């Protein structure tokens, strides 16, 4: 097997993306998504060939400065072959000498082999879960797979006249962010910065890899969702709701999203990941229950951190604390 590393100006987008779509279909492994990997980092495109054919691809990021950088992956490679992953990490370490590897993202990564992470030296491993709805089913079967309470809420929202629409421009991104700010203030959570959404929109909108959807009632936004997608798979990235929204508006929103994506020919709708362990009554419990009631297959996934150079990692942690 031969492993090669390319930078963004060296990779052939059509060929890279075609292989991603033929395998994992993960939208965060497409070349367009790498446009978000900037600032103090840059994307690297790792591919492995055997007998003249590509058998493995992985888009990752190098963060930091020369001689003091770390490796980060937002999502899984195209397969979980232990030999390929070991070769990929070995090749990256030889070229860039990262002091650690951070491979963990609740929203986008779907790596299912905990044993492989342990074999590669990941000492801090996180477990999480996600439910994925198969859109290749009939619309009737998809609706039957939704929990009865969600179905009743969807019907109620329809009777109340809740409407569904897709955002078309940056003004809708602003509209989404305004609602998300209110959501996080209400739940005492921490929202991501507005420029994260604007940059994601600018990088991914033209290629159709990011979309914003809304549910409104009497011209007032009730609920919104941000979807990151490929032609095969859509992932629910972020959501926002109005305080005291019309009953069922959020349920209705995701049902309409699933129907639209099915009509467009997508195969899967991923409701995004959540931690597996939480205390009863925690707000995470309500979020998990809301997602799981849309049906689909619930699976466990893993991520974590592997330290290659302990003293550099200690310095890095101290630096973060100072900031």
Model-derived segments and their meaning:
Residues 74-78, 106-109, 134-136:
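Beta-hairpin (beta-strand-turn-beta-strand) motif
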